Amino acid sequence: MKFLFDLFPVILFFAAFKVAGIYVATTVAMVATVAQIAWVWFKHRKVDAMQWLSLLIIVVFGGATLIFHNDTFIKWKPTVLYWMFGVVLLGSAVLLRKNLIRAMMEQQVSLPEPMWGRLNLVWSLFFLAMGGLNLYVAYHFDTDVWVNFKLFGSMGLMVVFILVQSVWLARHMQERPAGANPQDDR
């Protein structure tokens, strides 16, 4: 359910684009993201840093798209988000010696230490590649193709990536004794 809730602005962007074009769709995405953040705030009194970041990026790039009447800005939005994720994952591992993928997943998954490093690297590279692919589609195809790619192509690639990763993880997962603390795996 959270996955669909997170996709809410993207789905509305897609629908608005099909009906009224890129500028209306951009406005709809901005309003939907603000509404989404407001809903999360009123319901939980807390908003994740990633949601704030997403709001900031849609407001900046969506705003630039509307102010300058140039859809190039909104087309850069996914790339900026993907590249930020990739750089943060890679940078935190290299510079801070902190594996963010492990921090997010270790409660659910028990892996040998070297696998956590590989998993973090693979996610980082995936996000960097997705950012590049988004730009390729944005600059080599028309806006209609880019919008379809944004919803179906990037989501499809994400699902395939997660499925392949799940198969890979299943081969390396360790049994954790009942009641064991994930911190003990370190």
From Swiss-Prot:
Predominant subcellular localization, coarse grouping: membrane
Membership in a protein family: Belongs to the YciB family.
HAMAP family assigned to the protein according to its UniProt record, in alphabetical order: YciB (MF_00189)
A Pfam family matched in the record: IspA
Places the protein is found: Cell inner membrane
Gene symbol of the encoding locus: yciB
Protein name in UniProt: Inner membrane-spanning protein YciB
GO CC field: plasma membrane
Function: Plays a role in cell envelope biogenesis, maintenance of cell envelope integrity and membrane homeostasis.
InterPro entries in alphabetical order: YciB
Segments traversing the membrane: 3-23, 24-44, 49-69, 76-96, 121-141, 149-169
PANTHER family: INNER MEMBRANE-SPANNING PROTEIN YCIB (PTHR36917:SF1), INTRACELLULAR SEPTATION PROTEIN A-RELATED (PTHR36917)
Organism domain of life: Bacteria
Keyword list, A-Z: Cell inner membrane, Cell membrane, Membrane, Transmembrane, Transmembrane helix
Membrane topology recorded in Swiss-Prot or TrEMBL: Multi-pass membrane protein
